[in-house]
From Swiss-Prot:
<protein>
    <recommendedName>
        <fullName>L-rhamnose isomerase</fullName>
        <ecNumber>5.3.1.14</ecNumber>
    </recommendedName>
</protein>
<keyword id="KW-0464">Manganese</keyword>
<keyword id="KW-0479">Metal-binding</keyword>
<keyword id="KW-0963">Cytoplasm</keyword>
<dbReference type="InterPro" id="IPR050337">
    <property type="entry name" value="L-rhamnose_isomerase"/>
</dbReference>
<dbReference type="Pfam" id="PF06134">
    <property type="entry name" value="RhaA"/>
</dbReference>
<dbReference type="GO" id="GO:0030145">
    <property type="term" value="F:manganese ion binding"/>
</dbReference>
<comment type="subunit">
    <text>Homotetramer.</text>
</comment>
<keyword id="KW-0413">Isomerase</keyword>
<feature type="binding site">
    <location>
        <position position="262"/>
    </location>
    <ligand>
        <name>Mn(2+)</name>
    </ligand>
</feature>
<feature type="binding site">
    <location>
        <position position="294"/>
    </location>
    <ligand>
        <name>Mn(2+)</name>
    </ligand>
</feature>
<dbReference type="GO" id="GO:0019301">
    <property type="term" value="P:rhamnose catabolic process"/>
</dbReference>
<dbReference type="GO" id="GO:0019324">
    <property type="term" value="P:L-lyxose metabolic process"/>
</dbReference>
<comment type="function">
    <text>Catalyzes the interconversion of L-rhamnose and L-rhamnulose.</text>
</comment>
<comment type="similarity">
    <text>Belongs to the rhamnose isomerase family.</text>
</comment>
<dbReference type="GO" id="GO:0008740">
    <property type="term" value="F:L-rhamnose isomerase activity"/>
</dbReference>
<dbReference type="GO" id="GO:0005737">
    <property type="term" value="C:cytoplasm"/>
</dbReference>
Amino acid sequence: MTTQLEQAWELAKQRFAAVGIDVEEALRQLDRLPVSMHCWQGDDVSGFENPEGSLTGGIQATGNYPGKARNGSELRADLEQAMRLIPGPKRLNLHAIYLESDTPVARDQIKPEHFKNWVEWAKANQLGLDFNPSCFSHPLSADGFTLSHADDSIRQFWIDHCKASRRVSAYFGEQLGTPSVMNIWIPDGMKDITVDRLAPRQRLLAALDEVISEKLDPAHHIDAVESKLFGIGAESYTVGSNEFYMGYATSRQTALCLDAGHFHPTEVISDKISAAMLYVPQLLLHVSRPVRWDSDHVVLLDDETQAIASEIVRHDLFDRVHIGLDFFDASINRIAAWVIGTRNMKKALLRALLEPTAELRKLEAAGDYSARLALLEEQKSLPWQAVWEMYCQRHDTPAGSEWLESVRAYEKEILSQRG
């Protein structure tokens, strides 16, 4: 430990103790909060099923930065490089299109064996895995409908894909000793004015009920469902709206996924957390950064990221909220994107843990809103950075921007050699 870091740490402990915060306890609590990193930042959501195919479903990865991963070995190596630069507990979130097989596998035929490399890798790196069926970038999703499709055979294909995905998810949880959160998102919707908004939702309701009909051990698998306001090519109508999935998760007691980019630009998911928790057992968060639309920019340490973290900590939702990331920027170094976004999420959680929440609650209850605002603003200037640097030191990761040197070296030695 350097003398400078030690001095800053001791001063920070004193400053936070003066406002009633035990920084050691804050770091212990931070180690209870894994962040699930999304594999698809590493290859622009290409996957291994048809890497040269186009990305569909109303989502876009923009940019053409060189060196993206082309197979499982490269993607896992890139993830390891990123994870070495991120302190504390982590998980990995996989989509079904990241299966590995010597022969083509139809999506409704995926099995645990197609993900054994990921499980062995997760064991070696002491990671939990989360999962997602991939209801996009496929010939049978080309007309914009999957689980709500009017064609019975096509709809059944996607139902079977999601059912197979649940078994893969349960396999992850059983093998790794930590439940896999499997999130269902579908792109279903219409570009222009829709006359029958009810029938697709009736079909989706029945399809989801069939998907989750097989009882799985909750110690291994957790179902989550995710809404969206609109997508490219589905601007006028989205079958799986917020109201639909809020009702579904409440009535079926599944987890509800809140994605930071899936609502109107004036809405924030930090304000939705406490409301949703009154009705659903668990939440999955997709922390992202929408710029004017669901653009999935890299997560910043901005007001909304901080507000999301603060909601989790203030209401002691550690065991009911699963934190995942969802962004994909192909215009910058993809490993840097992972590191920046994940470190920012963890910084926000640390800052939330260092907040004098008990004192703030007292002021709020007493109606002293002037003091509440003053204290909220003053605590922003407390030396949280010194606590973060100590956390990084204890987890053998770079504290400041020194991590960039490692990313640049990896880019020169590894990424630049890829076609």
